[in-house]
């Protein structure tokens, strides 16, 4: 998963298999920086299977931090954009997959694909506020309304069952 910085200058993307975070110039499309989330080194490692398995990245509203869902590590990684390093990790439930930040920067929400739930954390303390079961066992995407009143969670159908959108 990937997102563009609030100022539109950079595109951030993660690679699940190599466990890397990429900062890409949004104008000339050149890769500016790469960060290994497995080793926190400032260079690209030989291809390996990441234990972190990052699946989504989203910037904070200020653009100073990046929130990354570590599906294989059951953690959210918070990266300081200026220093280009992991500054904090938050233990999650099983399989954080997609992540969204509230427009005021106070909360992050992640789908927990292996738990059939979504969790809400405060960004100032990294503390879980709530865990909410979804209508099916496979939550996927999440987006927060601009007024921060609602989160829309796409959940996958099972077998012939249609997918749904849960509103929390």
Each language-model region and where it sits:
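Predominantly soluble domains enriched in secretory-pathway, periplasmic, or organellar proteins
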Residues: 1-168
């Amino acid at each position: 998963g990937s997102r563009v910085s609030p100022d539109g200058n950079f595109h951030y993307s993660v690679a699940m298999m190599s466990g890397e975070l990429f900062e890409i110039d949004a104008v000339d499309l050149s890769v500016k920086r790469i960060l290994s989330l497995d080793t926190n080194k400032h260079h690209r490692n030989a291809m390996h299977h990441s234990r972190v398995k990052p699946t989504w990245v989203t910037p904070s509203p200020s653009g100073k931090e990046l929130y990354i869902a570590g599906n294989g590590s059951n953690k959210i990684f918070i990266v300081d954009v200026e220093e280009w390093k992991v500054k904090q990790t938050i233990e999650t439930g099983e399989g954080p997959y997609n992540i969204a930040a509230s427009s005021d920067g106070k909360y992050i929400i992640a789908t927990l694909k292996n738990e059939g739930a979504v969790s809400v954390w405060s960004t100032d303390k990294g503390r879980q506020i709530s865990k909410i079961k979804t209508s099916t066992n496979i939550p996927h995407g999440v987006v927060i309304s601009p007024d921060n009143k609602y989160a829309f969670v796409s959940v996958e159908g099972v077998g012939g069952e249609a997918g749904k959108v849960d509103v929390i």
